[in-house]
Amino acid sequence: MKLHELKPAEGAVRAKRRLGRGTATGQGKTAGRGQKGQWSRSGGGVRVGFEGGQMPLARRLPKRGFNNIFKKVYTEVNVEVLNRFENGTEITAELLKSTKTISKIGKDGIKILGEGNLEKALTVKAAKFTASAQEKIEKAGGKAELV
C-alpha cells in the first residue's frame, strides 16, 4: 500500500451541511437559527466576557499589583553549567544562546550565579555576577568581566 492509495473508511466522510439552500434540505429558510432575535442576525451575539448585564467577573475581582517599568530582567546562569565549555573559552550571552545553554537573553543581559563548582579557567562576560560566582570563576583561574 502506498500513501496515494489510502482512503477513509466507508461512511466516515459526510458531506458538509449547506445551510439556507431550500426547505427540502431541512436547513432552509432560517438555516437553524430559529425565528427572530439577536442570534438570528448577521453579526449577532455578545462580546467576550459579557454576562447578560450583570457585573462581569473581570470587574468584580480587585486589581492587583503593577508592572515596574524600571525592573531589571536578567537570564540567570549557574557556574556549574559553564563546565561544558573548553578551557580558556570566552563566555558571552550570545555564545550561551547559540549553544542552546540558555533559551533567550534577558532584556538586561545575563547574571552568573554561584550554584555548583567550576573546574575550567574561563573568561566570563556578563551584566552581573553574584559574589560567590565571581569567587569561583577567579578560583578556577578565569576572569569575570562586567559588560
Swiss-Prot record:
Q: State whether keyword rRNA-binding applies.
A: yes
Q: Mark out the compositionally biased spans (Gly residues).
A: 23-35
Q: Which domain of life is it from?
A: Bacteria
In Gene Ontology terms, what is one molecular function of this protein?
structural constituent of ribosome
Q: Which GO terms describe its cellular component?
A: cytosolic large ribosomal subunit
Q: Does the keyword Calcium apply?
A: no
Q: InterPro entries, alphabetically?
A: Ribosomal_uL15, Ribosomal_uL15/eL18, Ribosomal_uL15/eL18_sf, Ribosomal_uL15_bac-type, Ribosomal_uL15_CS
Q: Where is this region: Disordered?
A: 1-47
Q: Which GO terms describe its biological process?
A: translation
Alphabetically ordered keywords of this record: Ribonucleoprotein, Ribosomal protein, RNA-binding, rRNA-binding
Q: Name one Pfam family in it.
A: Ribosomal_L27A
What job does the chain carry out?
Binds to the 23S rRNA.
Q: Which HAMAP family match?
A: Ribosomal_uL15
Name the protein family.
Belongs to the universal ribosomal protein uL15 family.
| Oligomeric and partner information | Part of the 50S ribosomal subunit.
Q: What is this protein called?
A: Large ribosomal subunit protein uL15
Q: Which organism is it from?
A: Clostridioides difficile (strain 630)
